[in-house]
From Swiss-Prot:
Superkingdom of this protein's organism: Eukaryota
Annotated localization: Mitochondrion inner membrane
Annotated membrane topology: Multi-pass membrane protein
The name this protein goes by in its record: NADH-ubiquinone oxidoreductase chain 2
């Protein structure tokens, strides 16, 4: 692809969520969503293969449907109230339609079916954008209108997402699908706490991005799209695979790593709001997620098959210089931030 075209595309992807976050006008929020949607489509279909074309088509159809629902809500709301923002007096049906359409954009269960398939059909670096930056705009809209959300629907979306994210990742061998189901589970945690303490949603999103970025960097460094590829890469880049194991445990929420912080804070806040059943179910599903992360670490580091690969261990000096600095820094942040919990939560 032409470098100038790539610059324009990435700039549009960057500006879309920024416009959405900085707007209180529903129409401008919708414009920001559409900018990021239309800009990422060429990246999804850039690799000329049936799988990438299928991924781009599925992504476009799902996101376009959600965008049409959002635009319909905006028009009907303006017709009823004469305002370009949602109010307490807004029709409940319109609020529920907005919530469901944003759930489709985020990949929350039961509207999650497109996310693993799309992530599986695209390159790792585009998958990183899809699972991190593209989540910011819909979440920012939910954050602005969190007081208007229906708690029942929000709870159903949250608990179903946590269940799907935990169970869906159990039988996967493709690393991109594992990260997709991880994203679904984390979005469920963010949605669960949104009606009660939206600031914890922002904290969870920040830590989720902080954990997902180094995980994808390690996968890209080894070109690892399957668990078997990761296990074969152990004799070449043992330090990177060690960091991968630590990041996976942090993603699973194992104390005392950073990933434990948002789960701890969210469960505490849910208990304060008398949501003991919800918090118990989510804690059980968190253990299930931790199990398949641990199983992934076991399969890629402790079950190495005999190999005739005589290639020498790759020194960190011969790897990408950017990764030499970024990856250790992000790994430290993704493992040792728990002592700052009191400052982060307050």
């Amino acid at each position: 692809m032409n470098p100038i075209t790539l610059i324009i595309i990435y700039f549009t992807i960057l500006m879309g969520p920024v416009i959405t976050m900085s707007s209180s006008n529903l129409l401008l929020m919708w414009v920001g969503l559409e900018m990021s949607l239309l800009a990422i489509i060429p990246l999804l279909a850039n690799k000329k293969s049936p799988r990438s074309t299928e991924a781009a088509t599925k992504y476009f159809l799902t996101q376009a449907t959600a965008s049409m629902i959002i635009l319909l809500v905006i028009i009907l709301n303006y017709k009823q109230s004469g305002m370009w923002t949602l109010q307490q007096q807004t029709n409940n049906m319109l609020l529920n339609m907005m919530l469901i359409s944003l759930a489709m954009k985020l990949g929350l269960a039961p509207f999650h079916y497109w996310l693993p398939e799309v992530t599986q059909g695209i390159p790792l670096h585009i998958g990183l954008i899809l699972l991190t930056w593209q989540k910011i705009a819909p979440l920012s809209i939910l954050y602005q209108f969190y007081q208007l959300l229906n708690p029942t629907i929000t709870t159903i979306l949250a608990i179903s997402s946590v269940f799907v994210g935990a169970w869906g990742g159990l039988n996967q061998t493709q690393t991109r699908k594992i990260m997709a189901y991880s994203s679904i589970a984390h979005m469920g945690w963010m949605t669960a706490i949104l009606p009660y303490n939206p600031n914890l949603t922002l904290l969870n999103l920040t830590i989720y991005i902080l954990l997902t970025v180094p995980m994808f960097i390690t996968l890209m460094t080894n070109s690892a799209t399957t668990i078997n590829t990761l296990s074969l890469a152990w004799n070449k880049t043992p330090m990177i695979l060690t960091m991968t194991s630590i990041i996976l445990l942090s993603l699973g929420g194992l104390p005392p790593l950073t990933g434990f912080l948002p789960k701890w804070a969210i469960i505490s806040e849910l208990l304060k709001n008398n949501c003991s059943t919800l918090s118990t179910l989510m804690a059980i599903m968190a253990l299930l997620s931790l199990f398949f992360y641990t199983r992934l670490i076991y399969s890629m580091s402790l079950t190495m098959f005999p190999t005739n690969n005589n290639s020498k261990m790759i020194s960190h000096h011969h790897q990408n210089p950017k990764h030499n600095f970024i990856l250790p820094t992000l790994t430290v942040l993704s493992t040792l931030t728990l002592p700052l919990s009191s400052q982060l939560i307050t």
